[in-house]
């Protein structure tokens, strides 16, 4: 019996300002900062790729997340896979998922992908300058699993 593949969209939650990014990269930094400053590197290289339908959206806005889910369904996407950050109990860029958990919408399937690496200044060609370090311990693993269980017990995850 063949199972039908379900397309899942990777969802980077870096599209709203945070105090950490303000400190590390400058006031108001989001991933849009990098998108807008992209430049062509060779003939025929189209840059920057500016956003279309939703513009330079802000993931703090619930209507944006609702529209993204609607667009995803229209284009045959079956779920979102949100990048999830956990640094010894510190979560960052968690607001979109937390607001979805609280509000129960958009009513669209999702999963989490643990972005399990140090945050560094690699963009600035300083990969050894660690901003947030990944450390591992049994105690922290248990806390992380407990948090994840609260997410996985929802109907749409």
Give the predicted meaning of each segment:
Residues 1-157:
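Glycan-processing catalytic domains of CAZymes
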């Amino acid at each position: 019996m063949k199972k039908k593949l379900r397309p899942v969209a990777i969802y980077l939650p870096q599209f709203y300002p945070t105090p950490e990014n303000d400190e590390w990269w400058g006031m108001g930094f989001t991933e849009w900062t990098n998108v807008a400053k992209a430049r062509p590197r060779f003939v025929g290289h189209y840059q920057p790729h500016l956003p279309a339908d939703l513009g330079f959206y802000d993931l703090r806005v619930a209507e944006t997340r609702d529209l993204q889910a609607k667009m995803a369904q229209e284009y045959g996407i079956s779920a979102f896979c949100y990048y999830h950050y956990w640094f010894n109990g510190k979560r960052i860029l968690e607001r979109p998922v937390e607001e979805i958990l609280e509000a129960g919408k958009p009513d669209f399937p999702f999963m989490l992908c643990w972005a399990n690496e140090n945050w560094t200044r690699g963009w600035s060609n300083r990969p050894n300058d660690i901003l947030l370090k990944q450390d591992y311990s049994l105690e922290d693993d248990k806390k992380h699993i407990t948090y994840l269980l609260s997410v996985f017990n929802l109907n749409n995850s």
